[in-house]
Structure formats: C-alpha cells, structure tokens
Swiss-Prot record:
It comes from the Bacteria. GO terms for molecular function: RNA binding. The keyword Protease does not apply. Residues 135-157 have a biased composition (Basic and acidic residues). Keywords: Cytoplasm, RNA-binding. The keyword Nucleus does not apply. This is SsrA-binding protein. Gene3D superfamilies: 2.40.280.10. Its main location: cytoplasm. It is found in: Cytoplasm. The gene is smpB. It holds the Pfam family SmpB. One of its GO terms (cellular component) is cytosol.
Length: 157
C-alpha cells in the first residue's frame, strides 16, 4: 500500500481572487514546506484569503498564506503561521511572471492549493485588477446564468 494519502481534492481556494481580479494565465508551482506545515495542511488548516505572490531576487514567494499549526505537530519547533514560503517554478515561468508584474495593473495571486500525489501544489495566476463596474457586471452575468438555468429546468419538467 502507498505510504502517502493520495487525494486529488483541493485543500484551499482563494475565492476572493476570482472576485477582485481578471485571471489571465495560470501556473502550477511547488511549495517549500516544513513537516509541521504538511501535517497542518493535511488537517485542512489553511487560509489563502489575502495571499499574494512576490518575486524577489529571481525567486517566487507566497506571502500571507496562513497555515495554522497543530498543537500536537509543532512541539519542538517555533511555528510561524504566516511565514513567507518559497514557490518552485521554472526560470522561464518566473521571467514571464516578472515581466507582466512590472507592467502597471498586473499582479500575481494564488488561486488554490491542492495535492498532486504526495506533494502540495499551488495554482497561481497572472491577474489584472477589476474595476467596481466590472465586478457589478460579473455579478449580473452570474445572476442571469443562474436564472436562465432555473428557467430551462422548469421548462423541461
């Protein structure tokens, strides 16, 4: 039997990113974690609400991703729940992201954290901030799609 629990399930999602930004391009990145962090992630103690990605000295870093330590897992280590974590990307991907971030109005945000085999992966995206009227229009479009589905569902009964 496999030693690791294999689950394709998403660990955490950053729903606010889809509301606040227009997603342009997605990337899959590995993440450097300590043992207690992996145990906390397995327990689902992750929050990505105000997380963002910065590129410093040619390396991608995940900021403000809160991984709450388990009381039983981090007894001998001082656990920093909101520590900055290094993301693992190819040089081409980092250069591409860095080139777009330097343009005005573009940023890089994490969208989700998930298991891929025994490893934790982070889905990050190049994004552009939405204006207030864009957010309103997106909400109207979602409401109309929901209403349209209801109408079709009633018509097919």
């Amino acid at each position: 039997m496999s030693k690791h629990k294999v689950s394709p399930a998403t660990i955490a999602r950053n729903k606010r990113a889809f509301h606040d930004y227009t997603i342009l391009e997605k990337f899959e990145a590995g993440i450097v974690l300590q043992g207690w962090e992996v145990k906390s992630i397995r327990a689902g103690k992750v929050q990505m609400i105000d997380s963002h990605v910065h590129i410093k000295r040619g390396e991608a870093w995940l900021f403000n991703c809160l991984i709450t330590p388990l009381l039983s897992a981090s007894t001998h280590v001082v656990a920093d729940a909101s520590a900055n974590r290094k993301l693992l990307l190819n040089r081409r991907e980092i250069d591409k992201i860095m080139g777009r971030i330097e343009q005005k109005g573009f940023t890089c945000v994490p969208l989700a954290m998930y298991w891929k085999g025994p490893r934790v992966k982070v889905e990050i995206a190049l994004a552009q901030g939405k204006k207030v009227h864009d957010k309103r229009q997106a909400q109207k479009d979602k409401d109309w799609a929901r209403e349209k589905d209801r109408i079709f569902k009633k018509a097919h009964r």
